[in-house]
Amino acid sequence: QRYISYAVFCLKKKMEKQTTFLAGLMIMLSIVFGAFGAHALKTILEPTQLDTFDVGVRYQGFLAMGVLVLSLNTHRFAFQIKGILWAMLIGMFLFSFSIYGLVLGPHFLGANAFRFLGPVTPIGGAISIISWCVFLFRLLKYGQA
């Protein structure tokens, strides 16, 4: 019994490290991409394209901050949060990085580059929204530990 509890504890700690690291990495990248957009892309992109790129940067930062806060507090929840955190990260990645590809692809790789990413953006957004809804539902249902 004690060994099983210890194994579960170790798995939770490893998961916390992974999601915390990935959230921190995504926050750092949102800062880098924001600076890249504000300086290097200003002369390359049209204002509407720059605004679209900025939406990806903004949501990447917001969603990554949320994942960081939750991953640092997994011990406070009376329910499993691992799947929710991974869904949040996947949704954020699909949403933001598909926007980056759609905006930057035509400028660097040709007019039709990354057009296939068009449907990926709303799928990533939906995954992000649903994962936050599941988190809130479970929080209301099970509360905190």
Which residues make up each language-model segment?
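Positively charged, low-complexity/disordered segments
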Residues: 1-15
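Polytopic transmembrane helical bundles with strong interfacial aromatic enrichment
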Residues: 16-145
